[in-house]
């Protein structure tokens, strides 16, 4: 089982490390043709507008949409969550539109407002250390979206079908439980496809 990490920008090596430490084969994705090699994909944190520009530059938008529409699992963290949103507050449309949610960018403020919190993430982990850096917030979700975690009453982790997304950076700690939960999602999907 192979899991790709979109390697255009952002915390790529940290995701690779946690995936590898959890027993998955992890590869950096830089070209559209590489998506065919992987069973699941991580859209890492970084800067969402820069990431979107690079996605367009390398003609990855349509292949990423098709990857998600095929039912293969995708995990988005921080900027990745923004890319997965159907709607961005104050803007017309989201980017990939995989999750029926309204997201507000930089809702927790700029870099100096970075902080850590301990969260319970439903079905994933209790007391997970979450690192927030200029983090987005999920302001609203549709009826098919499962809220997995909240911080001070604000939604910070969601799941819809084969899509998992969080406002924080799970890759910036040594706690691999969110990655392990994602690996399990990918493994279960791979078993279904094999039958």
UniProtKB/Swiss-Prot annotation:
Q: Name one GO biological process term.
A: glutamine catabolic process
Catalytic residues, chain numbering: 78 (nucleophile), 169 (charge relay system), 171 (charge relay system)
Q: Which CDD domains match?
A: GATase1_PB (cd01749)
GO annotation, cellular component aspect? cytosol; glutaminase complex
Listed Pfam families: SNO
Q: Which UniProt keywords apply?
A: Glutamine amidotransferase, Hydrolase, Lyase, Pyridoxal phosphate
Query: Which residues are listed for L-glutamine binding in this entry?
Result: 46-48, 105, 133-134
* Highest taxon in the source lineage: Bacteria
Q: What are its E.C. numbers?
A: 4.3.3.6, 3.5.1.2
Q: InterPro entries given for it?
A: Class_I_gatase-like (IPR029062), PdxT/SNO (IPR002161), PdxT/SNO_CS (IPR021196)
* Reaction(s) catalysed (UniProt annotation): aldehydo-D-ribose 5-phosphate + D-glyceraldehyde 3-phosphate + L-glutamine = pyridoxal 5'-phosphate + L-glutamate + phosphate + 3 H2O + H(+); L-glutamine + H2O = L-glutamate + NH4(+)
Write one Gene Ontology MF term. Answer: pyridoxal 5'-phosphate synthase (glutamine hydrolysing) activity
Q: In which pathway does it act?
A: Cofactor biosynthesis; pyridoxal 5'-phosphate biosynthesis
Subunit details for this protein? In the presence of PdxS, forms a dodecamer of heterodimers. Only shows activity in the heterodimer.
Give the protein's function: Catalyzes the hydrolysis of glutamine to glutamate and ammonia as part of the biosynthesis of pyridoxal 5'-phosphate. The resulting ammonia molecule is channeled to the active site of PdxS.
Q: Which family does it belong to?
A: Belongs to the glutaminase PdxT/SNO family.
Protein's UniProt name:
Pyridoxal 5'-phosphate synthase subunit PdxT
Q: Which organism is it from?
A: Shouchella clausii (strain KSM-K16) (Alkalihalobacillus clausii)
Question: Coding gene?
Answer: pdxT
């Amino acid at each position: 089982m192979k899991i790709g990490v979109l390697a255009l920008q952002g915390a790529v090596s940290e995701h690779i490390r946690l995936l590898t430490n959890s027993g998955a084969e992890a590869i950096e994705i830089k070209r559209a043709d590489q998506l065919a090699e992987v069973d699941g994909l991580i859209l890492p944190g970084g800067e969402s507008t820069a990431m979107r520009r690079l996605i367009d530059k390398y003609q990855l938008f349509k292949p990423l949409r098709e990857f998600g529409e095929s039912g293969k699992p995708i995990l988005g963290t921080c900027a990745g969550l923004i890319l997965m949103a159907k709607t961005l507050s104050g803007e017309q449309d989201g980017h990939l539109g995989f999750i029926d949610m309204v997201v507000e960018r930089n809702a927790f403020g700029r870099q100096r407002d970075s902080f850590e919190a301990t969260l319970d993430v439903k079905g994933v982990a209790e007391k997970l250390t979450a690192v927030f850096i200029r983090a987005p917030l999920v302001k609203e979700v549709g009826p098919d979206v499962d809220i997995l975690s909240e911080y001070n009453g604000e939604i910070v982790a969601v799941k819809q079908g084969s899509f998992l997304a969080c406002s924080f950076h799970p890759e910036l700690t040594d706690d691999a439980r969110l990655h392990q939960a994602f690996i399990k999602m990918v493994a279960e999907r791979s078993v279904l496809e094999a039958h």
